[in-house]
Regions:
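A structural signal for multi-pass alpha-helical bundles of membrane permease subunits
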Residues: 2-274
Length: 274
């Protein structure tokens, strides 16, 4: 290895370490603050990093006062609803755009790409009016509604299907499979990694969605909305706020650790052919 290659490798590792530290510091600060007293959490002394005593009172108060189990159930229903709907619709639409030929295909997919470039806040008022007229306000269905179809999911699965060889479909036709059988038994299983990646993306977006739950649903509140309501106008109990935030982070961390292999494979496969 030449001196230039060594220097480039050192520079790359230095940048990666710097980026990792930048991303981990807020998370570590959240963990440490959750165990501190209010005085320690608001101290301006730069040397007060670790708590004097590791207190679990903030976690106990948050669990008792916020009914975390009920919030977890609401959030779980929200995530399951959006993930199932998004993966199902994106798989069907992605296969149609990626493997089938029909009139208006390019125009329709251009509209999908255009929707990806439009800020989601623009659709909030039309979505609210639709949910209101369908009588779904203050129900779990109102939370799931915006995630039934996603332009990003359609694009992701389309790229995954385009990366599969055409020989598979030709072999399936020779064996007597129709379009539905080819899709269900041959093509769809090969894009499982992309489906998992889309499911994780959808779960994360649903988990941190704040504006829509606050607008359309006051009775069935997910974790994101409950955390937002903990923040006061003039004062905040930072240890309790950080304890609640830490408890809210745990499911997403566990989800990613379980499916990180499929997540990386799905992104790599879908981005292999643009």
């Amino acid at each position: 290895m030449s001196a230039r290659d060594k220097a480039n490798r050192v520079l790359i590792h230095f940048i990666l370490i710097l980026v990792s530290i930048t991303m981990l510091v807020p998370f570590l600060w959240m963990i440490l603050t959750a165990f501190k007293t209010m005085t320690e959490a608001t101290s301006v002394n730069p040397f007060v990093i670790l708590p004097s005593t590791w207190r679990w009172d903030s976690f106990k108060e948050v669990i008792e006062n916020m009914d975390f189990l009920h919030l977890y159930i609401n959030t779980l229903l929200l995530i399951l609803g959006r993930v199932v709907c998004a993966v199902l619709t994106a798989t069907l639409a992605g296969y149609a755009f990626g493997r089938l030929n029909f009139r208006g295909k390019n125009l329709m997919f251009s509209l999908v790409l255009f929707q990806m470039m439009v800020p989601g806040q623009i659709f909030i008022i039309p979505q609210y009016l639709m949910v209101s007229k369908m009588g779904m306000l203050n129900t779990i269905f109102a939370l799931v509604f915006p995630g039934i179809v996603t332009a990003f999911g359609t694009f992701l699965l389309k790229q995954a299907y385009m990366g599969l060889p055409k020989d598979l479909e030709e072999a399936a036709r020779l064996d007597g499979c129709n379009i539905g059988q080819t899709f269900l038994f041959i093509m769809a299983p090969l894009t499982r990694s992309s489906m998992v990646a889309l499911g994780i993306f959808t779960a994360v977006f649903a988990y941190k969605d704040l504006m829509w739950p606050l607008i359309c649903n006051k009775d069935v509140m997910p974790l994101s909305a409950a955390l937002a309501k903990m923040k006061g106008q003039y004062t905040n109990n930072y240890p309790q706020l950080m304890a609640a935030s830490l408890l809210a982070c745990i499911p997403m961390i566990v989800l990613y650790l379980i499916f990180q292999k499929q997540f990386i494979e799905g992104i790599a496969t879908s981005g292999g052919k643009l």
